[in-house]
Amino acid sequence: MKKELRQQLRSINRKSYPAYKGLKGLYHFGNYILSIDHVQGDPFASPSHVSIQISHRDTGFPVEYYKDTLTGTTLCDYLTRQFEKQVSQYSFRAKGSGKSGLLTASHCGQEILSRTACEITEKGITARFFVGFPANGRTINATELEKILFDFLPVCIQKSFFYSSLNAKELQNYIELAEDQEFIRQTLPAKNLCAFIADGSILPRESGISSRPMKASIPFTSPDSLRISINLPHKGKITGMGIPKGITLIVGGGYHGKSTLLNALELGVYNHIPGDGREYVITDATAVKLRSEDGRFIKDVDISMFINDLPNKKDTRCFSTLDASGSTSQAAGIVESMEAGSHLFLLDEDTSATNFMVRDAFMQQVIQREKEPITPFLERAEDLYKKAGISTILVAGSSGAFFHIADTIIQMDNYVPKDITASVKKLCSQYPLPAVSVTDFQLPHSHRIMSRPAESSKRLIHNSRGNHSDSGAAKPERLKTRISGTDGFSLGRQEIDLRYTEQLIDAEQTAALGLLLKYAVEHLADGRRTLPEIVQFLWKNLSLHGLSFFTENQKISCGYATPRIQEIYACLNRYRGL
């Protein structure tokens, strides 16, 4: 009971900081249960983990607001935003040294993500957050913690997690928007589309460091030839530009909106909040933004559809390197994304390896085919669509070669799209491509077997399938992770560079990838399982049990967000320790 908590606080006041450890446990606060899950070691350490549980009966939310994963995730996102707004007003109002008085929850961006900050269970809602337990030096200041737990938090919780305290109409619109967005995404295949951009969308962002919509920007207007209408379950009829499956080229002068459109499409794999401007920019959920990554690690990837007959006789059907070139990195990225189940590739000429994308006629005359190991993307894009079902949306500004293979050509003119397919196709006959001989298209084969690196120990690790991955009886040394925002993280002594995994949008997703990779290395990498087998195991249990499945004690804190399966593949493929 909360009375006992108050008594405990008063009994440990002015004692040394470790006495806070005795507060771990559950406390009933009437209409919610407070759980102190982890107590920080000292006031300068990472803050303590605290959570609350509220029954569905007490929260009062309509059942249809959490009837499935989509609505449940959306409701949790809304509640997390409300709670974060409330607790930010009280952070550091309790005084002390170090992180004393810190009160913080997950800070959400423009996209809706599934976060451990708020989860819906059969019994109710669980919210997780961080609290800096106050101290003067390293002496407990329980009076200040009492303010947080008994004065500040109850107000924040009441205003954030109870239906009667919230704007019911705003929440309804929030849920209905998410359902409409998902309806469009599910409708795309039936309409033979890979993406949709609604009329009136605001695509430009406020600045390079802000993802909020730019004020006074030009609303998106679809060309008539590509305009379609969709009847949504809640909003009703909307119109916009449907991008057909196949090969789509986005062209135009500099600063006319080509990359802005592509950036909106790459984030269209996520649902967006009301007022974002891109609420109805919807992309195939499996879409992957690809680029060259000089220096990246590649292990056992079949890039032979793009690169063959290397001078060093390296086998490109099972290619490995510690320091990839632009072309080999982009080839590997495409093959890895195919393995990850992508049906749509998004590319920008500006961030691609030029020699990987195209070879002009003059270069083909100078460098004979048998002397060039690279089969450019230009010569594989049609096969990728016709034989593998993978569409491409490409931003191009310098080479006209792609006009010949494009099914749809969109010109961005001062942020206004124009369908110029017919007029460009007439011009193609005046600028024919030279005849080329391309080897037959074959789907790549996965070769990568994941083995545990030496630093994670060769001793016995019990995995969740109930078998053993090695011999021995001692407990293995656990690897530590350090997160660096969306740029990547370290696991043990290995750095995982995710700077160019552009659809990784939140540091909490990076933290989740660190958790998943750590689990894979410690429990699954045994020298027998392939990378796809391991990713599918991770994804299955993530979907069924959530991220807590991958922690040592099956408990999770605030600070994690679920990544897509495509980013899980990208993370494991970039881990040099395997």
Where are these regions (language model features)?
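N-terminal accessory targeting/assembly segments
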Residues: 1-192, 203
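Carboxylate/His-rich catalytic cores and anion/metal-binding grooves
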Residues: 189-195, 199, 255, 262-293, ...
